[in-house]
UniProtKB/Swiss-Prot annotation:
Belongs to the Ycf3 family. TPR repeats lie at residues 35-68, 72-105, 120-153. The gene is ycf3. GO terms for biological process: photosynthesis. Signal peptide: none annotated. This is Photosystem I assembly protein Ycf3. Pfam families: TPR_1 (PF00515).
Amino acid sequence: MPRSQKNDNFIDKTFTVVADILIKVLPTSNREKQAFTYYRDGMSAQAEGEYAEALQNYYQALKLEIDPYDRSYILYNIGLIHTSNGKHGRALEYYYQALKRNPSLPQALNNIAVIYHYRAEQATEKYQSEVAKILYNKAADYWNEAIRLTPTNYLEAQSWLKQRENI
């Protein structure tokens, strides 16, 4: 039984019912419907912290989904899981793939910036100031782009960028 059919969360159930109705009435291929079902089940598993199950669903969705925009969100969610698991290098790969298909994905830009900022802090702790400087600059570049796309978001990043200008 698909995960979406055994969910006990009211909001998830509501989303599932609405999604099922849309899948039935929208003029999409069976392949697209199946891809969306895997994606939806992946989101549900991810929300419950079942990352291995979520990844399986996302990988199945990737095999079926052909639309670049939709693929970008699948790739982004895979990146989120790798970030949560501390696999930052792997997460970056998926965020970059998502951006290649959807350059206007500010959340991927933000997450890339967060990883570079984290790595810069690690370099600073190891007294690798030149490496840290490069990584902080990369973080700033990605945050600036994310903020350009969504000026009212990423307030902490905006604050950090302003402080950085004043140093």
